Amino acid sequence: MDITTTEIYHDGHHTPHGWRRWLFSTNHKDIGIMYIIFAVFAGIVGGLFSLLFRLELAMPGGTFLNHDFQLYNVLITAHAVIMVFFMIMPALFGGFGNYFVPLLIGAPDMAFPRLNNISFWLLVPAFLLLMGSAFVDGGPGTGWTLYPPLSNLSGHPGAAVDMAIFSLHLTGLSSILGSINLIVTIFNMRAPGMGLFKMPLFVWSILVTAFLIILAMPVLGGAITMLLTDRNFGTTFFKPDGGGDPVLFQHLFWFFGHPEVYIVILPGFGIVSQVISTFSRKPIFGYQGMIGAMVIIGFVGFIVWAHHMFTVGLSYNALIYFTAGTMIIAVPTGIKIFSWIATMWGGSITFPTPMLFSIGFIILFTIGGVTGIILSNSALDRVLHDTYYVVAHFHYTMSLGALFTAFAGFYYWFGKISGKQYPDILGKIHFWITFIGVNLTFFPQHFLGLAGMPRRIPDYPEAFAGWNMVSSIGAGISMFAALYFVFIVFYTLKYGKDCPNNPWGEGADTLEWTLTSPPPFHTFETPPHIEG
């Protein structure tokens, strides 16, 4: 072999240094770490945006943003897109998925290391495009749903919405490539003796999520491409004057959008299964039922999309079907909730930070699920659609659901990733500040919604002022908690104690706890053999 090949061959056998290690990285651990850092950064930005419009909504009068209501809508749009595509998906699916799936199945790395590299680096230009769009032609004030005619040229002349569309194209491509990589890795690179039904539930959750992404993301890509041609090339997919229909866009968007919310939460389900099993010192209750529940959630999630559209004039039969289908999703979700509770039942439970976040997740996600059952009624949704009741519902499942699972996973695995263990008391303080802050933010929104306050409005009658003030105070507390979390990370990296191979004791029995903390640059060069 010539000199360059030899250099490249040997280059992979020691840890590279400097910026090249990160920019050119094909190592699943480094890429996972970059995903997590990116997600924390994006989460702070998205959180600051939400704080801005919560300050606007703290009292009636529309004074904080100086009556710039387009800016208000741009902040709403950016907050949603950042939190979904640049915070929670990169953290749970990209970050923990990339870092821990190979470790949990005993694989040396991902199946396609270079594909892994571009999956991450596509997110950076996507994020820059989205941020840039806010400064062009007044920004995209469409909401993350991009409904025409508001997102058409009539509603948004200028390049802002086009930039947002390209941003979504890139982040969708990133997710699809990452999904292909993870599916091939899980199917082809498991250690000898590890059958599919011996994999940890986190790996199963990532596998189901990857299939959802591959099936859902291209539909979003198609819908926003049609919107792009409507805006720039004279097509009329969504313009009634040319025989198009704006409701078609809603069908296409939500055919992606509903699986998307399960894409967001399923990896979190997997993390919670690992954490609760570890700190209950018991195997998870109903392992195969848990897998079945995730698969059923993934499947049914694709056939209930129009429950987001109960007020657009669907036929009576469609309303009945989508109401019933949506309610059915509560069954596999209930299986998971009760299996987690059954895992804890009779266990020898300890309550470190990851366990607190997992139990907090179960409580809050259940509240979000109950309001979801209420909203699944098309008759009740006539009243509640596009009110703050809906905002409260999906933030209880995403902001208090998926986010709590991300924190649970972070505190569970941070010692393994960094080699430094955080002081548990700091994590517990973070949990309680977050728990109080997010509940103070979103619980009053149920009352506002039931009283009739619409979503996505910058000003409101004085009757709604009280609960809005409470909600805004909660947002401030939550933002403080997020900054406190960043402090904990830096404090731990500088002053944390060295983390042992297995800081959690006998309950932690998956493969990653057999490695050093942090794991070596290359792991499982000789595959482990799984017994039993």
Curated annotation (Swiss-Prot):
InterPro entries: Cyt_c_oxase-like_su1_dom, Cyt_c_oxase-like_su1_sf, Cyt_C_Oxase_1, Cyt_c_Oxase_su1_BS, Cyt_c_oxase_su1_dom, Cyt_c_oxidase_su1_bac. It catalyses: 4 Fe(II)-[cytochrome c] + O2 + 8 H(+)(in) = 4 Fe(III)-[cytochrome c] + 2 H2O + 4 H(+)(out). Cu cation binds at H258, Y262, H307, H308. Its main location: membrane. GO terms for biological process: electron transport coupled proton transport; oxidative phosphorylation; respiratory electron transport chain. Keywords: Cell membrane, Copper, Electron transport, Heme, Iron, Membrane, Metal-binding, Respiratory chain, Translocase, Transmembrane, Transmembrane helix, Transport. The chain crosses the membrane at residues 33-53, 74-94, 95-115, 118-138, 163-183, 200-220, 252-272, 284-304, 318-338, 355-375, 394-414, 431-451, 473-493. PANTHER family: CYTOCHROME C OXIDASE SUBUNIT 1. Belongs to the heme-copper respiratory oxidase family. This is Probable cytochrome c oxidase subunit 1.
